[in-house]
Swiss-Prot record:
Keyword Transferase applies: no
Motif GXGXXG motif in this chain: 322-327
GO cellular component: cytoplasm; cytosol; extrinsic component of phagophore assembly site membrane; phagophore assembly site
Cited InterPro entries: Atg7, Atg7_N, Atg7_N_1, Atg7_N_2, ThiF/MoeB/HesA, ThiF_NAD_FAD-bd, Ubiquitin-activating_enz
Subcellular location field: Cytoplasm; Preautophagosomal structure
Name this protein carries in UniProt: Ubiquitin-like modifier-activating enzyme ATG7
Primary localisation category: cytoplasm
Keyword Magnesium on entry: no
Biological processes annotated in GO: autophagosome assembly; cellular response to nitrogen starvation; cytoplasm to vacuole targeting by the Cvt pathway; mitophagy; piecemeal microautophagy of the nucleus; protein modification by small protein conjugation
Protein's organism: Eremothecium gossypii (strain ATCC 10895 / CBS 109.51 / FGSC 9923 / NRRL Y-1056) (Yeast)
Record GO terms (molecular function): Atg12 activating enzyme activity; Atg8 activating enzyme activity; identical protein binding
Record-stated family: Belongs to the ATG7 family.
Amino acid sequence: MSQSLKFAPPFQSFVDASFFQVFSRLKLDVLRLDSHELPLHAKVDLAGLARGSSISHVFLDSQSFDEATASLPGISLRGSFFNFNTLEEFKRLDKGRFLSEQAQLLWEAGVNGYLDEAAGFFVICFADLKKYRFYYWFATPCFQPETLELKVVKREALTEIDKFSNFIEQNKILCGVLNEETGEVIRASRHELERYSTLVVRDTSNIEHCPTSLVKNFVAVWRHHNPNRSECRVLLLRETCSFSLELSVTGDAMSTSQLKASGWERNVRGLLTPKISELGAIIDPTKLAEQSIDLNLKLMKWRLVPDINLDIVKNCKVLLLGAGTLGCYVARSLLAWGVRKITFVDNGSVSYSNPVRQPLFNFTDCGQPKATSAAAAMKAIFPLVDATGFQLEVPMIGHPLTDEARQKKDYEELRQLIRDHDIVFLLMDSRETRWLPTILGNLESKLVINAALGFDSYLVMRHGNYEQPESSRLGCYFCHDVVAPSDSLTDRTLDEMCTVTRPGVALIAAAYATELAVSVLQHPQGNNAPETSESVLGSVPHQLRGFLPQLSTVKLRTPAYKHCSACSSVIVDAVRENGWEFLREALVDHRIVERLSGLAQVQQETETFLATMEISDDDCFDEIS
């Protein structure tokens, strides 16, 4: 007497955290808003059935997106991955209809290709990458035409399965047909299915007398090619307790038949509902912070700036000369841009007035060196940043030598630091402090960004590339001057010694300085970019001058000045050839620089010209009577 056939679920999924980590990178860097189907390649663990499991596992891990996984030992299973851009879209999906559509695709693959291609799986997923929470649902479509009916005519144990060892050891498929003439199990296309009526299935179930639901798929395809046969034999191979079924197969299994499909996986409570994977709880917090920083930046590439090069920013090594108000705000902005290497140089200590204006310091830092405190604060904000602080004094032109050995050492260390970095920010309080770094930036061909503050105004500029011809080169901070910088710090009142500015000026200038640097990095010509051109982020001006009273900013261009005290060829060459010997003299007497650069001659010519323009009494107009 024939009996109805009961089936076991085909698989239990096991999704490793590495699967979602790979998908996260794929989503951010490649797919972005693209939600097209992705191929998956999984391995079926039948060995686990011998260890007490009732259903075999399908493993998804970091290799599942790699086609090469299919060539690895073990049974391979093809699948598809569908990612949704919003949680609402994931929820709105008609799950029953979607399962039926996927079942139809497997049915057609089995009918038109090989029998084993009627088995497969898919995963639908929404990734909340801000919280590292993944909503997903695994399904293995199992189907049969609505009119198809399967009955068990005979069930018996299989004791001699050694003859199937070649099929088990050498094949990566779940199902084939038995060549009844040779006893060999072969992969089954339409030709073999029309000829043979014994299916051989690697059973993924370990439940007694209860085969995998995939048997329905295989028998339905067999029936399609054998509409006039009503008996089919199925050999179910297991690690233990293999058995055979003789089935009575009735009903229609044509291509136009409506399929009954099932296959959504139940959760641990036995409910038909998606699962949630919370990776945020298991990922190293520092790695999670790194990925979150990258997330915000990579989202720019999705719609807003697809061509932005984030790696060139991330890999840029930045030197901040000055760890005061400007230095702190520039450092925070660079960190937000993903810069990983930031070095501070400052010779001061944190004063009690600093923490309210300089965001890298707090009350407990007062009295500590600024450079090292700023670096420590950056690491506290983001532990993976390579932040270092150097407490050294930048030798200043026009200031007498007080300790030549120490100042020479500071010069050599400063030159090496500039050599080791890609961008140099000049963020100090005085003009003369910026003179030597400007020359060294030219010597080492570095991108130099300069920011300076007034009470209610600011200047942000990029220095021209010294390797360009002087006639077309952009000017530096000192190209406006007709005198060399000198001691501006001595004999100053309290309001002149402190940096007195409107509090918002530093934030604006720091933001412009950072954005200008990043925009230049994005330009194909880098620091050679003409000030009238644009990068993917917009314009790359030479300099910006801002005025808070009018809430205005203007873009200006200043060409390189051939008599400049910092970027003229004679000054740069003098430092290149003579190094500290030249600088020692210039530090003591700034007029040496004026004479060498030609500024002294310009001053003399100007005075002579003005003298000839003096109007004598005889040149006055007659009074009108």
